[in-house]
């Protein structure tokens, strides 16, 4: 299970609960480091752990440091490696590649023609075997990249003068000298007392592994790279880095950890794992699909701010037709703008530093929570007709609000957990399913007040004699119902399909569709329910109009129509009956 901390919120005063909730946000963010991931698992029993997924461009780098791996005694005595990492290139928006395989099949024991790299941890020989499948030119080297590369330029020629093929693993052209310096530091004489190791697998005094370069077999073909595995007390450690060598290797990559000893149900053995993952593209720490999000969220924040300012100006010009719900709509637009602004700032710092600023991240989550609650409350209030034509909610409508508001709080908590936790955490998938289910329930619940209002207007249009006004309101509610359906359809279903269909570098179109659909929904809702005198939603039949309708019915029933005329109060001239 993932290392985490929990705080209770029961038995507190409302003010204390608010401070506890804010402290909970800070606590959850304390373990989040953006695109520099640190995952600690203790007593874990899963056989497959999806550590992370990232979109790489050319010269992008992946660094992995396994600082602690503690297995049971039975697992360390097995000669064939059944523990290790896998790096595979996956399709954008797809689930992990091993999700559809047999649960008893070990992905480390099968050969694959797909784009795949395996890191097999051999506990007995204290080494890590690197196996590559498919045509690829990934540069795999031991150790981590230096903080700042010492020099850049073309790769140095091989001193042996032998040709290289796809199985040769050499460092990135931009980090050649830095990697050689790191490897030179590892050539420390073996300390007495260590276990006898094969040639090329020496350990320094601190238990750090030393690797041997690829050697050539009898057939002249380069062998797989072998990394040294460090052994300190009862734990193991090693590190490596990968550089994307060409455009052919660009794509979405998924890094997974496998413990094939736990594939058989009922025979799982707990293990401990601590790993650091650092992913970087030439432009920063953001994935290929996330690089445009900083500018996208900043532009959309300005659009929502402009829409909110324009809406407030409309409210100030029509003071006599303004209701409380109109100001609630203005608050929603400004809250959405501020939330997107903080989201944009977070992506900026993640791209430049690898992690967000905790204070700004907390502000983003608070405004995101307020925005989500205001959105669903506003949609439900407009659909129920509150403040426009009535100031009391029915029992059914109160139950809807009693369901939607707590679910929105739960959905925002799930969103915060997903954003702050690592993908490899044991409860990450559970919170993701909770967010999807709760969001689906909320989207369905907000439709009920609109449907009830439509049925009420249908019944009232044939009984109270106010046919024209009720039919106009009925038409408006039907339009609003279609608008809500389209908003849910575009921001949930169409957006997910778009995310699966487009290439990895165009994944940001998903967020563009969601934010554009939200802005269009806000604008159309404001246009339909603007505080104007000719808005049928705000019109109530006047007493003189009711008398005219009653007089017209009397004259029609009595037959006194011939030669009579009525003065039209809204137009010059006369209108023949």
UniProtKB/Swiss-Prot annotation:
Which GO cellular component terms are attached?
A: cis-Golgi network membrane; Golgi apparatus; Golgi membrane; membrane; trans-Golgi network
Subcellular location(s) per record: Golgi apparatus, cis-Golgi network membrane; Golgi apparatus, trans-Golgi network membrane; Golgi apparatus membrane
Give the principal location in a single coarse category.
Golgi
- Keyword line: Glycoprotein, Golgi apparatus, Membrane, Signal, Transmembrane, Transmembrane helix
| Superkingdom field | Eukaryota
Its topology with respect to the membrane? Multi-pass membrane protein
Which residues are tagged as glycosylated in the record? Answer: 59, 111, 233, 237
- Kindly indicate where the leader peptide sits in this chain: 1-34
Task: Provide a GO biological process annotation.
Answer: negative regulation of toll-like receptor signaling pathway
Q: Where are the stretches annotated Disordered? A: 144-224
Fetch the Pfam families from UniProt.
Answer: GOST_TM (PF06814)
List the transmembrane segments: 296-316, 325-345, 369-389, 400-420, 434-454, 482-502, 506-526
Functional summary from the UniProt entry: May play a role in intracellular immune modulation by activating NF-kappaB response and attenuating Toll-like-receptor response.
Which family would the database say this protein is a member of?
Belongs to the LU7TM family.
Q: Give the protein's recorded name.
A: Protein GPR108
Origin species: Rattus norvegicus
């Amino acid at each position: 299970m993932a290392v985490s901390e929990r705080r209770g919120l029961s038995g507190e005063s409302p003010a204390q609960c608010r401070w506890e909730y804010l402290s909970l946000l800070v606590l959850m963010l304390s373990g989040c480091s953006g695109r520099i991931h640190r995952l600690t698992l203790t007593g874990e029993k899963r056989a497959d752990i999806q550590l992370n997924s990232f979109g790489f461009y050319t010269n992008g780098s992946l660094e992995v440091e396994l600082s602690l791996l503690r297995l049971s005694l039975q697992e360390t005595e097995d000669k064939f490696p059944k523990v290790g990492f896998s790096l595979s290139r996956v399709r954008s928006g797809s689930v992990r590649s091993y999700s559809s395989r047999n649960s008893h099949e070990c992905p480390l024991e099968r050969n694959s023609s797909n784009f795949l790299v395996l890191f097999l941890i051999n506990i007995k020989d204290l080494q890590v075997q690197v196996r590559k499948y498919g045509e690829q030119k990934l540069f795999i080297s031991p150790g981590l990249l230096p903080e700042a590369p010492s020099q850049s330029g073309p790769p140095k020629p091989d001193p042996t003068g032998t040709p290289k093929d796809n199985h040769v693993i050499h460092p990135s052209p931009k980090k050649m000298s830095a990697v050689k310096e790191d490897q030179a530091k590892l050539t420390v004489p073996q300390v007495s007392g260590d276990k006898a190791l094969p040639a090329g697998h020496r350990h320094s005094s601190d238990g750090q592994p030393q690797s041997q370069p690829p050697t050539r077999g009898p057939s002249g073909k380069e062998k797989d790279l072998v990394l040294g595995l460090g052994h300190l007390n009862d734990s193991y450690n090693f590190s490596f880095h990968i550089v994307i060598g060409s455009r052919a290797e660009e794509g979405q990559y998924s890094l997974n950890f496998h413990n094939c000893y736990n594939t058989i149900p009922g025979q799982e053995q707990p293990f401990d794992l601590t790993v650091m993952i650092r992913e970087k593209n030439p432009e920063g720490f953001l994935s290929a699909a996330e690089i445009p999000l900083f500018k996208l969220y900043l532009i959309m924040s300005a659009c929502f701010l402009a829409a909110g300012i324009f809406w407030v100006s409309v409210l100030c010009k029509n003071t006599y037709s303004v209701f409380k719900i109109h100001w609630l709509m203005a608050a929603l637009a400004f809250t959405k703008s501020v939330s997107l602004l903080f989201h944009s700032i977070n992506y900026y710092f993640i791209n430049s530093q690898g992690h967000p600023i905790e204070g700004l991240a907390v502000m983003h989550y608070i405004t995101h929570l307020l925005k989500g609650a205001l959105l669903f409350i506003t949609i439900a209030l407009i659909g129920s007709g509150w403040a426009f034509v009535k100031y009391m909610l029915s029992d059914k409508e109160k139950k809807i609000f009693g369901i939607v508001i707590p679910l929105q709080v739960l959905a925002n908590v799930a969103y915060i957990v997903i954003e702050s936790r690592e993908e490899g955490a044991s409860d990450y998938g559970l919170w993701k399913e909770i967010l999807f289910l709760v969001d689906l329930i909320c989207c369905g619940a907000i439709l009920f007040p609109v449907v009830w209002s439509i049925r009420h207007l249908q019944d009232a249009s044939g009984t109270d004699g106010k046919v024209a006004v009720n039919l106009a309101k009925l038409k408006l509610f039907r339009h609003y119902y279609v608008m809500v359906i389209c908003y849910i359809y575009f921001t949930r279903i169409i957006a997910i399909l778009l995310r699966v269909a487009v290439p990895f570098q165009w994944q940001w179109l998903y967020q563009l569709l969601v934010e554009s659909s939200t802005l269009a929904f806000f604008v159309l809702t404001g246009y339909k329910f603007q505080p104007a005198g000719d808005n049928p939603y705000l019109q109530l039949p006047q007493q003189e109009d009711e008398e005219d309708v009653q007089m017209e019915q009397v004259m029609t029933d009595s037959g006194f129509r011939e030669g009579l005329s009525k003065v039209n109060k809204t137009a010059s001239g006369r209108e023949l009956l």
